[in-house]
């Protein structure tokens, strides 16, 4: 069965050093991967819990929140692509033991993220009405969906900055940091969902707007934790002691090479999801709410 062996089609390279045993490689892989697995599962689980907590308002609320998801993901597609690129580049720089280059890449990505997010946020808040209408809103979901979308996109900068920093930490092998920030962020989100959706313990009853505010508050806490992680001396991307906010031309070119293909993949995937969501939304509010519940349950199955 050597016909399908990769050694037949790949150019052989001399071994640079001793290859670790398979048992050691498996142990190291699990050690790095398990925090990311838990993080991914909890993010999907919290999305499911969010749906349950909003459902007390009725099927219109589930549908309204669901309508905002794909427009939001299209808005942050560039940052999802950037996080893929920065994770890959920081991992390379760690292998090269080039901390200065890794920190400069991270700093530049944070700067670009803040500027781009500000622009996208303003556009989405200003044009929330036509965006949500295009996404397939109905008379009973439109107002709640617009309100939710405006709050979420108004505070999306905390999500994008956290996303970029956590991606860099994953690339540096610090997957536990990303896990902790997401766990705390999601727990804060759930607590404020309970306080603000139904108006418990003296808090105002804000409905879907309360769910959006809870999400933003959770993102603020998570973002603060991510920023704090860059000031830890144990972190490979410890930002003190490194000057400059602009990476080298070589690093910028590498970011674009990795990020461009990731962005194209993200944008087309999200457009496909949006078109599918619009099709389902046209069936009616109750049908779309059922679809949203099903999608949240399905996300648990591939969160690992």
Short names for language-model regions:
Residues 34, 38, 68-71, 111-115, ...:
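Hydrophobic residues within alpha-helical transmembrane segments
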Residues 37, 41, 45, 49, ...:
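Generic alpha-helical transmembrane segments of integral inner-membrane proteins
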Residues 27-87, 257-280:
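Signature of the first transmembrane helix
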Residues 113, 168-195, 209-213:
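Alpha-helical transmembrane segments of multi-pass membrane transporters/permeases
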Residues 62-122, 159-178, 291-304:
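Small-residue-rich hydrophobic transmembrane alpha-helices
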Residues 45-63, 132-139, 195-206, 267-300:
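Helix-terminus/linker motif at the lipid-water interface of multi-pass membrane proteins
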Residues 235-293:
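Acidic, glycine-rich loop-and-beta core segments that form the ion-binding/anion-interacting portion
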Residues 1-36, 90-157, 203-260:
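Short alpha-helical transmembrane segments in multi-pass integral membrane proteins
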């Amino acid at each position: 069965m050597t016909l399908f062996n990769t050694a037949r089609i790949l150019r052989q390279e001399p071994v640079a050093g001793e290859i670790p045993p398979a048992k050691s490689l498996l142990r190291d892989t699990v050690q790095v991967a398990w925090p990311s697995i838990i993080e991914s599962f909890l993010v999907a689980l919290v999305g499911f819990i969010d749906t349950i907590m909003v459902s007390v308002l009725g099927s219109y609320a589930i549908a309204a929140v669901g309508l905002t998801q794909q427009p939001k993901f299209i808005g942050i597609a560039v940052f999802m692509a950037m996080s893929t690129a920065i994770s890959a580049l920081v991992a390379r720089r760690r292998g090269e033991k080039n901390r200065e280059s890794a920190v400069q890449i991270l700093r530049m990505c944070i700067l670009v993220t803040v500027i781009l997010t500000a622009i996208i946020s303003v556009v989405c808040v200003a044009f929330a009405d036509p965006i949500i209408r295009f996404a397939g809103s109905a008379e009973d979901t439109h107002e709640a969906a617009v309100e939710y979308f405006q709050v979420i996109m108004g505070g999306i900068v905390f999500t994008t900055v956290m996303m970029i920093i956590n991606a860099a930490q994953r690339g540096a092998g610090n997957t536990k940091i990303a896990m902790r920030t997401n766990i705390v962020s999601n727990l804060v989100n759930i607590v404020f969902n309970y306080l603000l959706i139904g108006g418990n313990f003296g808090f105002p009853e804000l409905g879907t707007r309360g769910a959006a505010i809870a999400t933003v508050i959770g993102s603020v806490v998570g973002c603060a934790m991510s920023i704090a992680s860059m000031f830890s001396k144990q972190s490979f991307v410890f930002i003190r002691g490194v000057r400059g906010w602009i990476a080298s031309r070589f690093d910028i070119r590498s970011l674009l090479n990795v990020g461009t293909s990731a962005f194209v993949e993200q944008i087309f995937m999200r457009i496909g999801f949006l078109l599918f969501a619009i099709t389902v939304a046209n069936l009616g509010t109750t049908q779309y709410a059922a679809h949203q519940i099903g999608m949240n349950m399905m996300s648990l199955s591939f969160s690992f």
